[in-house]
């Protein structure tokens, strides 16, 4: 058997790392194809070194662009590699343009597609990620669903049950494995001590197009952050995405954020550093699906700055509240989460998902 693992972003590298580690213990022929979907080295390449992962066999250097431009370039370049390598299975993870392009090329070439994190649904077709994940699921031969909720989403859409495997989420494997590394790493500890001034800080991330490309919505979120500071007197560490920084400047919101003494804006950091920031935060504010999961696993209360989530399990267990861009909801949610006991059950599995996936791809069963 021969596997092509196609990835292109930081979350994909993180969530596929447990599968890669499991593959390294086998005799399976496999390789990594990296589309380089993110244009910043800080945003993805650094993770291979941090996670002790082998370098990609292929770097496609696609970079940023419109959805059509980026996906089109990927289709062309991925096809060249798959025609050369002729794998039996292509493995993709998540909901990016890399995932859709990899799955489409493989499907056209009659190569089986294995979709890790299948069945997630926000039920919002305005999100590009929703289109990517739905299309990918419907052309996949192996659908690795993280939870029963995800499996039921797939069954409702008519996908055959014998293609669906509930394996848990590889984010649990990655979080548990790499937090230990982070806590022992002197450079990570030094970074943490240099950034964190107040022990009871909130951590903020913001990058979704529906938030940062909408001036009114972004303005509402920023104003909500200022109100939280005013009411709760908390320090906020804002790990800022390049796209978000660009929009904040464009909408004349950046200088106001930067001048607030309670807000510490930091450039994108390595995965291990970010894990430490998450683990030690009093509260996390985010629009990232992966961060919602990590917060839940790490037992840190989370508030999601979106109207919906494809991680409803985090809401069901009480680890997460959705507030969208509504300031009143945000302020109320902060009060609720600051008083919440961190005793919810992790709904994403026991950290063995990577091994399960490799067993299924190898033997066709758990």
UniProtKB/Swiss-Prot annotation:
Record SUPFAM superfamilies: UDP-Glycosyltransferase/glycogen phosphorylase
Recorded coiled-coil stretches: none
Gene Ontology annotations for the cellular component aspect, listed alphabetically: cytoplasm
Catalytic site positions: 207
Keywords: Cytoplasm, Isomerase
Lineage: superkingdom: Archaea
EC nos: 5.1.3.14
Enzyme class: isomerase
Location(s), subcellular: Cytoplasm
UniProt-listed InterPro entries: UDP_GlcNAc_Epimerase_2_dom (IPR003331), WecB-like (IPR029767)
NCBIfam families: wecB (TIGR00236)
Subunit structure: Homodimer.
Entry's family note: Belongs to the UDP-N-acetylglucosamine 2-epimerase family.
UniProt name for this protein: UDP-N-acetylglucosamine 2-epimerase
Organism annotation: Methanocaldococcus jannaschii (strain ATCC 43067 / DSM 2661 / JAL-1 / JCM 10045 / NBRC 100440)
Gene it is expressed from: wecB
């Amino acid at each position: 058997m021969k596997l092509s693992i196609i990835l292109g972003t930081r979350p994909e590298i993180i969530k596929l790392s447990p599968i890669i580690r499991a593959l390294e213990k086998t005799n399976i022929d496999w390789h990594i194809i990296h589309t380089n979907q993110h244009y910043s080295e800080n945003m993805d390449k650094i993770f291979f070194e941090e996670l002790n992962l082998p370098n990609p066999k292929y770097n496609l250097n696609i970079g940023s662009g419109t959805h059509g431009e980026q996906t089109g370039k990927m289709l062309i370049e991925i096809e060249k590699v798959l025609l050369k390598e002729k794998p039996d299975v292509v493995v993709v993870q998540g909901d990016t343009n890399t995932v859709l392009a990899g799955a489409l090329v493989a499907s056209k070439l009659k190569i089986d597609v294995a979709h890790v994190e299948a069945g997630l649904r926000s039920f919002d077709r305005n999100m590009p990620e929703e289109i990517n994940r739905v299309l990918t699921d419907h052309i996949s031969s192996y659908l690795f669903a993280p939870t029963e909720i995800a499996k039921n989403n797939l069954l409702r859409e008519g996908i055959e049950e014998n293609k669906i495997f509930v394996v848990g989420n590889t984010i649990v494997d990655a979080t548990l494995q790499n937090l230990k590394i982070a806590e022992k790493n002197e450079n990570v500890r030094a970074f943490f001590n240099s950034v964190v001034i107040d022990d009871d800080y909130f951590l903020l991330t913001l990058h979704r197009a529906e938030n940062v490309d909408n001036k009114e919505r972004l303005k509402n979120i920023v104003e909500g952050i200022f109100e939280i500071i005013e009411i709760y007197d908390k320090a906020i560490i804002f790990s800022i995405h390049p796209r978000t920084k660009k929009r904040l400047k464009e909408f004349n919101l950046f200088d106001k954020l930067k001048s607030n003494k309670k807000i510490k804006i930091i450039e994108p950091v390595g995965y291990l550093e970010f894990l430490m920031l998450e683990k030690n935060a009093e509260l996390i504010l985010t629009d990232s699906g992966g961060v919602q999961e990590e917060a839940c696993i790490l037992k840190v209360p989370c508030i999601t700055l979106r109207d919906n989530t494809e991680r409803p399990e985090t809401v069901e267990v009480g680890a997460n509240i959705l507030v969208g861009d509504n300031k009143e909801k945000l302020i109320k949610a902060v009060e609720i989460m600051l008083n919440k006991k961190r005793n919810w059950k992790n709904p994403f599995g026991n950290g063995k998902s990577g091994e399960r996936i490799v067993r299924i791809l190898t033997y066709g069963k758990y």
